[in-house]
């Protein structure tokens, strides 16, 4: 096992995380005129747009990061391990104070210093633990060796959406217990 591939995964995930946060802030700033113009629309419309921007920027930057690793002949498992470590560290920050997962997922109070509620951030990070390795593997095995084809891209995103629906269903089931 080469430490450079693991370190690349760790650093790449940090860079992707910062870039995605910057894109989210830009999306929020760009949507301000529309919020004032379309004031009568529910907040869900603007939230859905922000989440879509977040997911697209995350997927796009990971595409370039995985493509670089593929071209540098790194091993996929080592890159995934490095990115997994950073995700696990971020999730562990939520659990350090002794809160249960159910308490964290029920905390939709955004009165603190964060832009988004802690539950939303925790769920995004938890879903990324499952979705990110799948996305990286699909890119590595399906898209990068064969070139970028729309058919393959739709196949990858279809698989990810199916997994996401299952994760949301499992979360709702967990919260109802």
Curated annotation (Swiss-Prot):
Q: Where are the transmembrane segments?
A: 45-66, 79-96, 111-135, 153-171
A Gene Ontology cellular component where this protein is annotated is: plasma membrane
Q: How does it sit in the membrane?
A: Multi-pass membrane protein
PROSITE patterns in alphabetical order: PROKAR_LIPOPROTEIN (PS51257)
**Superkingdom per UniProt:** Bacteria
What keywords does the record list, in alphabetical order? Cell membrane, Membrane, Signal, Transmembrane, Transmembrane helix
Give the range the annotation lists for the signal sequence.
1-29
List the protein's name: Uncharacterized protein YwdE
This protein's gene is called: ywdE
